[in-house]
Amino acid sequence: MTGSGGAVIRPASPDDHDAIWQILRPVYRAGKTYCIPRDITRDDALADWFAQPFTAFVAEVDGRILGTSHVGANRPGGGAHVANASFATHPEARGRGLARALAQHALSWARAQGYRAMQFNFVVSTNLDAVHLWQTVGFGVVGRLPGAFLHPRHGPVDALVMFQTLKGDSDEP
């Protein structure tokens, strides 16, 4: 799939591990947006990113991987009809529409897989760019977890639960 700014979004492979780690490492080390140990190892981070039931994707611009996402069931069993996704982009991708392209791809992919909704369980409220992006692609805030994230600079901040229905009223159950 070709996304915004000429990005090609495709399923990730083991050959992409180094590039994905180069994107994830600074995000995780900063500790501002994910509930991931800041000192997570490369192997543990990649095992998590590629873990079932998720499918990992990369976004390439001019042959260079500048973004990644993974999409899969939010919960097993009775919650398996709701998707979840995570995203990260390289700093060079800022302002180029790559995060939006990854989000739109994730939503399209989830619809094609038969998911009826997508939920983000833990969006850090101080991650204003992400909150704004998710709202502009159709997510609403359906819950607020007071002080649930320990931000390295701001201390305890709220985490948001964001949700979007993927199927319309005319869709069969």
PLM features: what roles do these ranges have?
Residues I20, L24, A45:
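Hydrophobic pocket/interface hotspot
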Residues R94, F120-A130, A148-L150:
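Conserved beta-strand-loop-alpha-helix junction that forms the acyl-donor binding cleft
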Residues A110-V123:
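Conserved GNAT acetyl-CoA-binding A-motif
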Residues V8-I20:
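A short beta-loop-alpha structural element at the N-terminal edge
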Residues T2-G5, F87-A88, F122, L145-G147, ...:
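Terminal substrate-recognition subdomain of acyl/acetyltransferases
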Residues Q135-L145:
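Conserved acetyl-CoA-binding loop of GNAT-fold acetyltransferases
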